[in-house]
Swiss-Prot record:
PANTHER family: BIOTIN BIOSYNTHESIS CYTOCHROME P450 (PTHR46696:SF4), P450, PUTATIVE (EUROFUNG)-RELATED (PTHR46696). Transmembrane segments: none annotated. Pfam families: p450 (PF00067). This is Steroid C26-monooxygenase. Keywords: Cholesterol metabolism, Heme, Iron, Lipid degradation, Lipid metabolism, Metal-binding, Monooxygenase, NAD, Oxidoreductase, Steroid metabolism, Sterol metabolism. It comes from Mycolicibacterium smegmatis (strain ATCC 700084 / mc(2)155) (Mycobacterium smegmatis).
Length: 427
């Protein structure tokens, strides 16, 4: 049944719309009246060649699509649901080399190998080093007095965590930052002069060179673990490792840094929560920050056969877009979902991909990184205040902030609008 207040061609993945705001009210309307909604894209969709997609808005349905990898596949069209109009089908097909865009059995094999580097023990070994780095990041930024929170704070620890995990020299972290930005921000005018394909090629080449070096000189880092054969003879080839690093650079940098930025914006808008955090440092804060931010607004699957979802008939080959943003604010799952509550528990958000085979392999690393950097912010710049509005990334699927000017000392005049508990920044 069509939703009267939403035109059939209202495109929830429109990057221009998302530059200004997220479609919060429209998603809320769909959750109530048409939880699985067909979106017409009369002009066609770049890279896919179809004329629309199914948008899934309810928490339960998003989890069902995530769980049912037997009927909702990642391989046919990949996980990223929107590309620039000039994207070719051939370029989309190349994305299948990335773990995110694979189905079993290839996905099962690669994920088993990659999981070696993300065990609790492997992540735990990084904690002391990353805690020290988080403190240094916050202290360095605080000494500047004021600056761009994204560049000076929120991007730094995720980048350094990746560098530490992979054994990448810290001097090369800016390359990772640049490459990951250029690969994911093709629609944003700030990156209009870059070629995402070239950035991907440069990062893959860099990673393959790392793999070659570790094959000759093995160390204790994750690179060696992944390229050395286990007892079953399984290992990553150099090109498989290269594509894994592409995924890690995007997932580890873009999503975690955007969670950190949105989290600090939420604290600025909800000073009572910031005071609570500074006093108690609750472990539950990281998951609420991820829920609130939902840094990946949406991923997609493709129906592998005719299937019914939530009473709606979906045809084989149709794309099914999971709105993580909508699911994370589902009133049937979260009490007062539009209230930022760092003590929220339980918190079954889908910010790490819901459930199933594609659940975020680095979720524990992300939680640890978020906790460590906010502890460091609370220790070294407890009175931080915004002095400019956040500058959003133009993207149809990433909920990104490119720049945000703040006063680390708290001496400047705050300029983030909105009453506590509201969402004026369209996070």
């Amino acid at each position: 049944m069509p939703t009267p207040n939403i035109p059939s061609d209202f495109d929830f993945l429109d990057a221009t719309l998302n530059l200004e705001r997220l479609p919060v009210e429209e998603l809320a309307e769909l959750r109530k009246s048409e939880p699985i909604h067909w979106v017409d894209v009369p002009g066609g969709t770049g890279g896919f060649g179809d004329k629309g997609y199914w948008l899934v808005t309810k928490h339960a349905d998003v989890k069902e699509v995530s769980r049912r990898s037997d009927v909702f596949g990642s391989s046919p069209d990949g996980a990223i649901p929107v590309w620039p109009q000039d994207m070719t089908r051939e370029a989309v097909d190349l994305q299948r080399a990335v773990l995110l865009n694979m189905d079993a059995p290839q996905h099962t094999r690669l994920r088993k190998i990659i999981s070696r580097g993300f065990t609790p023990r492997a992540i735990g070994r990084l904690e002391d080093e990353l805690r020290s780095r988080a403190q240094k990041i916050a202290q360095t930024a605080a000494a500047q007095g004021a600056g761009d929170f994204v560049e000076q704070v929120s991007c730094e620890l995720p980048l350094q965590a990746i560098a530490e995990l992979l054994g990448v020299p810290q001097d090369d972290r800016d390359k990772l930052f640049r490459w990951s930005n250029e690969m994911t921000a093709g629609e944003d005018p700030e990156y209009a002069d870059v070629d995402p394909a070239m950035s991907s090629f440069e990062l893959i080449s860099y990673a393959m060179k790392m793999a070659e070096e570790r094959a000759v000189n093995p160390t204790e880092d994750i690179v060696t673990k992944l390229i050395e054969a286990d007892i079953d003879g399984e290992k990553l080839s150099d090109d498989e490792f290269g594509f894994f690093v592409v995924m890690l650079a995007v997932a580890g940098n873009e999503t975690t840094r955007n969670s950190i930025t949105h989290g600090m914006i939420a604290f600025a808008q909800n000073p009572d929560q910031w005071e609570l955090y500074k006093k108690e440092r609750p472990e539950t804060a990281a998951d609420e920050i991820v829920r609130w931010a939902t840094p990946v607004s949406a991923f997609q699957r493709t129906a592998l056969e005719d299937v019914e979802l939530g009473g709606v008939q979906i045809k084989k080959g149709q794309r099914v877009v999971m709105s993580y943003r909508s699911a994370n604010f589902d009133e049937e799952v979260f009490e007062d979902p539009h209230t930022f509550n760092i003590l929220r528990s339980p918190n079954p958000h889908v910010g790490f991909g819901g459930t199933g085979a594609h659940y975020c392999i680095g979720a524990n690393l992300a939680r640890m990184t978020i906790n460590l950097i906010f502890n460091a912010i609370a220790d070294n710049m407890p009175d931080l205040k915004p002095i400019g509005a956040p500058e959003r990334l133009k993207s149809g699927w990433l909920n990104g902030i490119k720049h945000w000017q703040v006063d680390y000392t708290g001496a400047g005049k705050a300029s983030v609008s909105g009453a506590p508990g509201t969402c004026p920044v369209a996070h």
